[in-house]
Amino acid sequence: MLHSIAFAPAADLHGRVADSSREGFARAMDISCHSFARMARLAAPLMQGGGSLLTMSYLGAAEVIDNYGLMGPVKAALESSVRYLATEQGPQGIRVNAVSPGPLATRAASGIQHFDQLLADAAERAPLRRLVSIEDVGALCTFMASDASRSMTGSTLYVDAGFHILG
C-alpha cells in the first residue's frame, strides 16, 4: 500500500521553520506524516499474512535543502515513523519503508521556490549525471511492494541517481 500525500501551507513552506505558524506546522504534520500512521493502523487488518506499506519522502528529511522549509522537519518525522511502524508491524509480517526520490518535475514540486534551478543542479551534480524519472520511482516501489523485498523493513531507499551521497 502506497502513501504519497504531502502538504504545507504556502506561507509556512517558503518561510523559515522558526517562523512557521503553529497551525501550519500542525496541519503539515497531520497531512504529511500522521496520515501514514493512520493508514498503517487501518491497513493492518486488511494485510493478514503480511504485506508492504510504503511512503514517499525526500532528501530534505536528512539534510537542509534550500527553499524546502517546513517540509524538512515533517519528512524527518515521517522517516522516523517508518522505523517505529516497522517495529510495530513487523510481527504481523508487514514491512514498512520509505522511498526517497530525487527531484522530480511534478505538480507538487512546482510549489517549491526556485525548483527549476534545483532540477538543473541535481542533474549536473548527481553521480549518474541525470535526474530520475517517475518510471524509476515506480520500479523501486513495485520492487518494494513485491515479495522480492520480503526481508527489507524500516528503511529509507533513495532513488536519485546518487544525488544523496554528495552531502
Which residue ranges define each predicted feature?
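Short, small/polar-rich loop/turn modules that mediate ligand/substrate recognition or access, typified
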Residues: 90, 95, 152-154
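Short-chain dehydrogenase/reductase
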Residues: 40, 82-83, 138-141, 145
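Short C-terminal tail/terminal secondary-structure segment
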Residues: 141-142, 153-167
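Conserved SDR Rossmann-fold cofactor-binding beta-strand/turn motif
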Residues: 95-105, 145, 158-160
